[in-house]
Swiss-Prot record:
One of its GO terms (biological process) is carbon fixation. The keyword Lyase applies. The active site is at 151, 570. Forms oxaloacetate, a four-carbon dicarboxylic acid source for the tricarboxylic acid cycle. This is Phosphoenolpyruvate carboxylase. It comes from Xanthomonas euvesicatoria pv. vesicatoria (strain 85-10) (Xanthomonas campestris pv. vesicatoria). One of its GO terms (molecular function) is magnesium ion binding. Residues 60-70 have a biased composition (Polar residues). The gene is ppc. Belongs to the PEPCase type 1 family. Its cofactor is Mg(2+). Residues 52-71 are annotated as: Disordered. The keyword Magnesium applies. PANTHER family: PHOSPHOENOLPYRUVATE CARBOXYLASE. It catalyses: oxaloacetate + phosphate = phosphoenolpyruvate + hydrogencarbonate.
Amino acid sequence: MNEYRSSLVFATPDLPLRDDVRRLGALVGDLLAEQVSAEFLDEIERVRTTAISRRESDAPPSTLSEQLTGRQPRDAEALVRAFSTYFQVVNIAERVHRIRRRREYQRSGTDTPQPDGLHDALRRLKAQGVTLDELSQWLPRIDVEPVFTAHPTEAVRRALLEKEQLMVASLVDNLDGMRTPNERASDAARFRMALTASWQTADSSPVRPTVDDEREHVGFYLTQVLYRVIPVMYETLEHAIEETYGSVPALPRLLRFGTWVGGDMDGNPNVDAKTIAGTLDAQRRAVLDRYQKELWQLASLLSQSTTLVQVSAELTAQLERYRALLPDAAARSRPRHGDMPYRLLNDLMRARLQATLDDAEGAYSAPSELEHDLQLILDSLQANKGLHAGWFAVRRLLWRVRSFGFHLARLDVRQESSVHARAVADALGQTDWDAQDATQRAAVLGPYAAGQEPLPRVDDEGNARLDAVFAALADARTRHGADALGSYIISMAHNRADVLTVLALARRGGLVDDAGAVPLDIVPLFETVDDLRGGTGTVQDLLADPVYRQHLAARGDTQMVMLGYSDSGKDGGIAASRWGLQRAQVELLEAAAELGVRLTFFHGRGGSIARGGGKTSRALDAAPRGSVDGRLRVTEQGEVIHRKYGIRALALRSLEQMTGAVLLSSLRPRAPEPREAHWRPVMDLVAERSTVAYRAFVGAPEFMQYFRLATPIDVIERMTLGSRPSRRLGQDAALSNLRAIPWVFAWSQARAVIPGWYGVGSGLQAAVDAGHEDTLREMAQDWPFFRTFLDDIAMVLSKGDLNIAELFSRLSGDLHTRFFPLIRDELALTKAWVKALLQQQSLLQHDPRLALSIRLRNPYIDPISVLQVDLLQRWRATDGEDEALLRALVACVNGVSQGVQNTG
């Protein structure tokens, strides 16, 4: 599997990637011959050759269908897994190539740092007039917080992810130019071992993961990857500042992490008060265990003897205090360590951590106490010639404690507004609660939200469940500290009454501090196009409400608003979603400023472009002026977590890119663009008319039947991807009730990728028809928002395939002739205008590396898609009861996901 079409040209810096792909492709061939047969490998080669020829000649998929249809499920599954394995090694090779390129930049010694890194950001800031004093004043305001979620978009199981890490490690080791032939042979053998073990591991688990499984999955990235790279991130920043400005200020904490795993109740009956408590306990154990192990490693390093060097009086005094506090632990210290005060203090610090784990006497009451002990050691080492005798290693632990605390990641809780509303209606005995407008409900809720009257308790499941949740949060605040809790997010928030409802429920649940305030940041999530449009009015009403304003004063007069990229796109199409999000941020910032409140945004992005995915640096550059202001809180979902944080070097790069982008957007935001006043009405028209086209398509009679037949949504719903159901419980199969993740996932599998582009062509054409073509070209050239939008659409279009999409569409029978012509015509219109406005002859002409990556994969995805259509038709003929066909279909889903590097 190592031939390439002559038209695939690698740039000189990417030639090592070409060599790796060829070598690893040949290794996949050897694997297939060994694990299946030489005849099987020959068959794979024939299919591959046909697929490439089809692409080169633009022939219809029927040329592949003749070779692939009618296979036994087991044979089909083997063929799919063969191509999936190729994608696996190509993906790994590309990740390792990113590490190679990063090292080349670092070794080059040139004045051109790697783009989007910290060195690049700081040099750009200095060139724009930012002084070291200004930078030092801004650093304490920087707060970057990736928030990991358990959305069911990760189509690769944990056992396979671990083997991928082994393969990556062997390739990274092989980058060392000093490796001997024997060592290189050992690297290759390690890769082959992990690859073979992957082949012998089923692609997906036979059972749906539990919340505990999802917590363990996310915990893997937090404790095994990010825990290790956090200190390196700060060291890189220090080096970049020193190299740029000549000196380094004391760095505050800039990074922390959040999680939804165990706290996201929206539509998931498996998440409740018990999972909230269990998650916080598990995360506490995990991070304290890491601290104990690291202190144990430091013990042997910090062996300084008082007969040779001194220690500070403060450290000696702390050691004596701890001996009195923990006499049993002090008695266990080895006599031969009696002249090693650092080691003795280390022993007692570990004892305090164990007491913290056990909730025993002598426990640390807060992470700040552990930080204080570590700082004592650092100060003593620095004062006594110990900078090169352990100071560096101790400071690394200090950075970890500052970043992870005793909680590892802040836990958010999320629930849908209607759940709260039903509970309050039942508690108040108001059967017409939904019929009342927001103002009426807010007036009723005011006394309960203010704590002037107790919200009645009622004995029903909904109220009991919510009471238990808020009681768990109150207990968690006492047990784990305020830093362990993130925000309480209200999904499908529509008005201020939705927020006051949560405030009233929190009081009833006992989440009240000593001052009588509710110590909880309540965050409305605006998800639909209409809610984005009405979000400014909602926030204005909320901030003008005296009860809520009193609550906000206790929270530092800072309000967070979450913006939903997924459901807004599903609701009105991607153009309306993107523009609605952009306008909402501008209007919300203006409203909050007028009312004297600092507004921060929480971006609910997914992995796909349709759900807000894309490069953080470009997204922040395109964001409205003032919308960052030092703060970035963004969800990291599904396959994005693996892609960005699965490898330490790439996790470091991701953190650098986010931090650098926040620094640039905050310290030197783009200058105001007076032409935006002229551009906005044009974008209003594009969004409005694209929404009309999109809703006409998805709102047509029998569309949902078409969707369910023309995509493998029924297979996706049977897969064991996550603990949350694909639609909200107790609701029908209408599009509004289907979650955005399976919606995007299904269309990506069918290669039509409808959510990522449909309606855009109609919107652009409407603007042209209204006489705005020159304005659109100006916008594409000079407006980062519009340029980024078009670039993202171009990328989505490049990953789609109309011929394959037509095969899927024909599964819908007579509905095909009604819906597919609409897809074909809108696609042609969208492609034409995207290329015209970007002034490109072909899609992704501006990004040849990405274009090459997609072209490398497409011929290998095609056979899987053709098989998928055949298997889907046969499986449905059994009413979905043939398990062998289902297993083959699941393999197809995983294979396409590996190929397009995207799920939901």
